[in-house]
Structures are given as structure tokens and as C-alpha cells.
Amino acid sequence: MRQILVAVTVALVVSILLTPALIRLFTRHGFGQEIREDGPPSHHNKRGTPSMGGVAIVAGIWAGYLGTHLAGLAFDGEGVSASGVLVLGLATALGGVGFLDDLIKIRRSRNLGLNKTAKTVGQITAAVLFGVLVLQFRNGAGLTPASADLSYVREIATVTLAPALFVLFCMVIVSAWSNAVNFTDGLDGLAAGSMAMVTAAYVLITFWQYRNACVTAPGLGCYNVRDPLDLTLIAAATVGACIGFLWWNAAPAKIFMGDTGSLALGGVIAGLSVTSRTEILAVVLGSLFVAEITSVVLQILAFRTTGRRVFRMAPFHHHFELAGWAETTVIIRFWLLTAIACGLGVVLFYGEWLATIGA
């Protein structure tokens, strides 16, 4: 528990202190966000708000994770794990793609950064490397950071993917989650607040896996997860980093996370879901992100096939704005829905454990 508190605290402090420094730096150099011309009229006054605040989030997560391990050395703690480094490596690589996208938007003074091909290639490259490496690094118990079995709250042994299919599966998961969080990041604080809740749920889930790991506590309901405690630290550090950033990103936002932050945070969800064997459960926890990307897909499909739009504007948080909801109303209600989804996800996780042990 001490390690979790250290991870949250260090990440929060780094994020909340680094963000205003970035605001001053980006403002001085004119690194402001461009706004969609077809967006809600209320968003036009946000033009010029500093972007790329995701740098503070990624730095906070790394600081929380590494700081906890450095502090643990004084108490003979274990070093970083393969699972932890791979999840953070994935998030950082995606954050790098987002950083380039943000930088191009700023340099060209328009709301279009990397073209779709370049952005997709960057995401797929990160996903392929992650998918290949995450099945390596077998530990003494014979566990690798991920399993080729499809998973709900643990492996579904009847659905095992061949290595090539598993890599393809990772490509889909990584691309879907990174884009889903990216689409959600359209209102002040919406993505950061929602991510804090989802990763808080992952703190509970992965810590429970750690306390009931088959390696240390074999028996009914135990979990075959390679490095559950390290995943807990990453989730906790993400909670702290998002809260620290949210202090400055809450409406009216002083800075936006940009694609730097949203793609990286999507990578955190993708990485945690794969390494904790909860790929299907993650869809419940991140229901808001799933709904946002689904609204975009439906809008595109409907317009191309019928010439009509399903929503006034997609992602669908803008639909409610154009329907007359205040931005803060949309944000708070979507946060509430995220909290409910996370609560449901934790209940499903715990319920499966109770059913497994026959309680």
C-alpha cells in the first residue's frame, strides 16, 4: 500500500508542478491550439490555449513509477518489471506520435497535424512492437507479460490466438483505445477526469490480482498475471498524473493535453488490459471512450451510406453541446457515467472471483 501512495503522490506532484511551467513555456513560444471551424461556437474562444500538456502527464507517470522503485531500493524492493516497462514504453511511443501531430498543428496553425497514414503507421508500429515483446520475457514461474488467450477478467483458455493473430489483436486494441481517448479529449477535463477513474479501477483490480496471485497464493480464483503489483503502480501513477493535470485542465482549461496526452493515455489502457488479462472487461471500464469512438464510426458510416448524420456532430459530446447543454454539464454527466461504468466493472471483476471460488 505504501508503494501505491508513493506512486500517486510523486506523479501528482510532478504533473501539477510541471503543467504550469509548460503553460508559460508554450505561451511564450505561441504553441496554441487551433480550433475546428465547424465546431461548437462556444469553443472558438479556446483558440490559442496552450496544447501538448500531455508531456506533463507522461512525465508524471514515469516519475511516479520510477520514483516508487527508487524508494523501494531502500527496503530491498524489486526493480522494474518487463510488464511495467512494456506498458509505459507503449504509452510513451504513442505519446511521441501524438507530440509530432501536435507540433505540426502548431507549426502550420491549423487543426490538422500528421496525415492519417503517418499517424496510423506510428500507432501500428508501436502496437506491433508491443505485441511481439509482450509474449517474451518469461519469468521463473513460466509467465510472460501477456497471454495469447483472449481474456475477460482472466484468460479464456478456449480462445487462444496464434502469435501472428495476437499481434494483429494488439494492433486493433492499441489503435482503438488510443483513438478512443483522443476523440474523447474534446471538452475541458473530460478525458483527464475519466482516465483518472478508469485507472483508479485498475488500481483495485491489479492489486487484487497481486494479493491473489497463483505464484504466491495458489488456489481457487488465483490469477496468472506476471507482474500485477507493477501494473498497480502504473495505474496509480496515471491516476496521480491525470489529477495533477486536471487541476489546470478543468474548465476553463489553461492547457490542453493534445494528442501527446490522449494517445499516451489510450496506450495505458491498452497496455494494462493486455498485461492484466482484462481485455474484455476494459470495454466496460472505459465505456465512455468506447461510446465516443463508436459515435464517430456511426456518423461516418451513416453519412457515407445514407447522406445523413446520426448526431448533430461527432464525437457525440459535441452533439449534446449543440443540443443546448452547457460544456460543464456535459463534462460532469459524462464523468458520472464513467464512475458508474468503473463501479460496474469492479463489481463484475469481483463477482467473477466469488463465482470461481464458489462463494
Curated annotation (Swiss-Prot):
<keyword id="KW-0472">Membrane</keyword>
<feature type="transmembrane region" description="Helical">
    <location>
        <begin position="156"/>
        <end position="176"/>
    </location>
</feature>
<feature type="transmembrane region" description="Helical">
    <location>
        <begin position="187"/>
        <end position="207"/>
    </location>
</feature>
<keyword id="KW-0479">Metal-binding</keyword>
<dbReference type="Pfam" id="PF00953">
    <property type="entry name" value="Glycos_transf_4"/>
</dbReference>
<dbReference type="InterPro" id="IPR000715">
    <property type="entry name" value="Glycosyl_transferase_4"/>
</dbReference>
<dbReference type="GO" id="GO:0009252">
    <property type="term" value="P:peptidoglycan biosynthetic process"/>
</dbReference>
<keyword id="KW-0131">Cell cycle</keyword>
<comment type="function">
    <text>Catalyzes the initial step of the lipid cycle reactions in the biosynthesis of the cell wall peptidoglycan: transfers peptidoglycan precursor phospho-MurNAc-pentapeptide from UDP-MurNAc-pentapeptide onto the lipid carrier undecaprenyl phosphate, yielding undecaprenyl-pyrophosphoryl-MurNAc-pentapeptide, known as lipid I.</text>
</comment>
<dbReference type="InterPro" id="IPR018480">
    <property type="entry name" value="PNAcMuramoyl-5peptid_Trfase_CS"/>
</dbReference>
<dbReference type="GO" id="GO:0046872">
    <property type="term" value="F:metal ion binding"/>
</dbReference>
<feature type="transmembrane region" description="Helical">
    <location>
        <begin position="255"/>
        <end position="275"/>
    </location>
</feature>
<dbReference type="GO" id="GO:0005886">
    <property type="term" value="C:plasma membrane"/>
</dbReference>
<feature type="transmembrane region" description="Helical">
    <location>
        <begin position="117"/>
        <end position="137"/>
    </location>
</feature>
<keyword id="KW-0812">Transmembrane</keyword>
<feature type="transmembrane region" description="Helical">
    <location>
        <begin position="334"/>
        <end position="354"/>
    </location>
</feature>
<keyword id="KW-1003">Cell membrane</keyword>
<feature type="transmembrane region" description="Helical">
    <location>
        <begin position="55"/>
        <end position="75"/>
    </location>
</feature>
<keyword id="KW-0808">Transferase</keyword>
<dbReference type="GO" id="GO:0008360">
    <property type="term" value="P:regulation of cell shape"/>
</dbReference>
<comment type="pathway">
    <text>Cell wall biogenesis; peptidoglycan biosynthesis.</text>
</comment>
<dbReference type="GO" id="GO:0051301">
    <property type="term" value="P:cell division"/>
</dbReference>
<dbReference type="InterPro" id="IPR003524">
    <property type="entry name" value="PNAcMuramoyl-5peptid_Trfase"/>
</dbReference>
<dbReference type="GO" id="GO:0051992">
    <property type="term" value="F:UDP-N-acetylmuramoyl-L-alanyl-D-glutamyl-meso-2,6-diaminopimelyl-D-alanyl-D-alanine:undecaprenyl-phosphate transferase activity"/>
</dbReference>
<protein>
    <recommendedName>
        <fullName>Phospho-N-acetylmuramoyl-pentapeptide-transferase</fullName>
        <ecNumber>2.7.8.13</ecNumber>
    </recommendedName>
</protein>
<dbReference type="GO" id="GO:0071555">
    <property type="term" value="P:cell wall organization"/>
</dbReference>
<feature type="transmembrane region" description="Helical">
    <location>
        <begin position="80"/>
        <end position="100"/>
    </location>
</feature>
<keyword id="KW-1133">Transmembrane helix</keyword>
<keyword id="KW-0573">Peptidoglycan synthesis</keyword>
<dbReference type="GO" id="GO:0008963">
    <property type="term" value="F:phospho-N-acetylmuramoyl-pentapeptide-transferase activity"/>
</dbReference>
<feature type="transmembrane region" description="Helical">
    <location>
        <begin position="231"/>
        <end position="251"/>
    </location>
</feature>
<feature type="transmembrane region" description="Helical">
    <location>
        <begin position="280"/>
        <end position="300"/>
    </location>
</feature>
<keyword id="KW-0460">Magnesium</keyword>
<keyword id="KW-0961">Cell wall biogenesis/degradation</keyword>
<keyword id="KW-0132">Cell division</keyword>
<comment type="similarity">
    <text>Belongs to the glycosyltransferase 4 family. MraY subfamily.</text>
</comment>
<dbReference type="Pfam" id="PF10555">
    <property type="entry name" value="MraY_sig1"/>
</dbReference>
<keyword id="KW-0133">Cell shape</keyword>
<feature type="transmembrane region" description="Helical">
    <location>
        <begin position="3"/>
        <end position="23"/>
    </location>
</feature>
